[in-house]
Amino acid sequence: MPWTFAHPAIVFPLKQSRYGRWLNLPALITGGVSPDLLYSSGMYRAADEAHHFTGWFYTGLPVCLAVLLIFHWLSVSLKTVLPFPVTDPLTCSLRKNSVILLSLFIGAATHIIWDAFTHETGTMVRALSVLQVSLLQGMTDGQEIAVYKVLQHLGSLLGTGYLCLKFAQYQRALPEAEKRGNLIRLIRLIALAVLGALCTAPLAYGLAQTETGVHINRFVFYELSLSISFFAGFVVLAALFQVIRKR
């Protein structure tokens, strides 16, 4: 999927299934986005390693643990800016922390398997010629649209739509006061995402330059991956600002 935050759509049905109820949802989500987070920090070689099962353990797993620690330290602050419940997943229980580690790996596995079918360097894309069939010819600089690329964008649209549906279902069950508060926080979050995208656009545009012009696929990749760092930073700053303002 070209959009990292569409990946958690896969883990929600898993968590709600008969066999996945005991898994930790925050860890599933963190693991589900972890292989792409290294792209957001410019660590492209490490990110490529994180898209393989063995490589994930020494690249993606440390990122997951860092994210969980950030949530552990800022869980109270983040509640003021996020339109959904924020829970601290870390505990003193060895059993529960073991479940967290397993959930991180399962979440990452869903990401790695999906990307195997939807990326040019994916294992299944290389193995199945049908995924390499070009559906749109004539684009310059080798920017053809193949089956795997269509699956990328279709997966993003369906995944994002599913997450929006789950959020709407969550909202309907809340009292009116909480609904209004969550709506305000959601609008602020969207504004921060737009701000992050605007800050990233000049950098992505420069990195996507080629001798023949702008490489569209490369621009989309840099824009969607690098904007996550700006967005995450803005969210943390907004959370800290809300806490300071209320003191």
Predicted features by range, described:
Residues M1-R247:
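N-terminal membrane-targeting hydrophobic helices
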